């Protein structure tokens, strides 16, 4: 980007001065990422960049259609995973082994990284949780280097109870 006096004045070849991000909430700013995206829009506007927020009411339908058509410039979505997540669905690219085809990886990021694929398959083949954590950490480092996503929040399974109704000394 060309920057003059702290403002973007021109985009490089193949880039634009504005992009649209599709948010899959209910169309009322209720997606967990909506606030951070709104703040990013304001910050980018200060330097001359326009981020268009398309907060759709049909959520994943619009995003899914856009992703499948290859027209989504930017998008946000929450992936669900088990406590020991298998990364194949999201990041695996080897078509011969279930990537980028029906029943395999969604391949939305378009990453084709043999090292990442090998680490995913190696982790998938082990039942050792400690070993899998090490491999998944390596995978996440590679994914961060690809800069295809920005992790915005993390959910953790939790149990909520009232200590007035549950004797906490009985919890193990």
Positions of PLM-derived features:
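Short, solvent-exposed loop/beta-turn-alpha elements that line the ligand-binding surface or hinge
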Residues: 1-15, 64-70, 90-125, 154-172
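Periplasmic binding protein-like
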Residues: 21, 45-99
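Active-site lining segments that contact anionic ligands and/or coordinate catalytic metals
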Residues: 14-19, 71-72, 147-149
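Surface-exposed patches in mature extracellular/periplasmic domains of secreted proteins
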Residues: 51-56, 131, 135, 154
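Append "and occasionally in soluble cytosolic enzymes with long acidic Gly/Pro-rich linkers
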Residues: 1-42, 131, 138
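Sec-exported extracytoplasmic/periplasmic mature domains
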Residues: 41-49, 68-71, 80, 92, ...
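Stable alpha-helical elements in mature extracytoplasmic
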Residues: 29-43, 59, 63, 75, ...
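Solvent-exposed loop/turn segments at secondary-structure junctions
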Residues: 25-29, 58-60, 79-84, 141-142, ...
């Amino acid at each position: 980007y060309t920057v003059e006096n702290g403002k973007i004045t021109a985009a490089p070849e193949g880039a634009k001065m504005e992009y649209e991000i599709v948010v899959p909430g209910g169309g009322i700013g209720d997606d967990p990422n909506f606030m951070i995206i709104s703040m990013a829009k304001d910050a980018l506007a200060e330097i001359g960049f326009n981020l268009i927020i398309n907060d759709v009411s049909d959520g994943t339908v619009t995003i899914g259609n856009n992703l499948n058509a290859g027209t989504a410039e930017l998008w946000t979505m929450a992936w669900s995973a088990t406590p020991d997540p298998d990364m194949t669905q999201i990041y695996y690219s080897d078509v011969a082994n279930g990537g980028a085809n029906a029943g395999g990886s969604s391949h939305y990021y378009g990453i084709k990284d043999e090292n990442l694929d090998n680490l995913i398959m190696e982790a998938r083949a082990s039942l050792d949780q400690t070993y899998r954590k090490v491999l998944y950490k390596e995978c996440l480092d590679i994914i961060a280097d690809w800069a295809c996503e920005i992790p915005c929040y993390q959910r953790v399974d939790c149990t909520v109870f009232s200590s007035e109704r549950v004797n906490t000394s009985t919890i193990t």
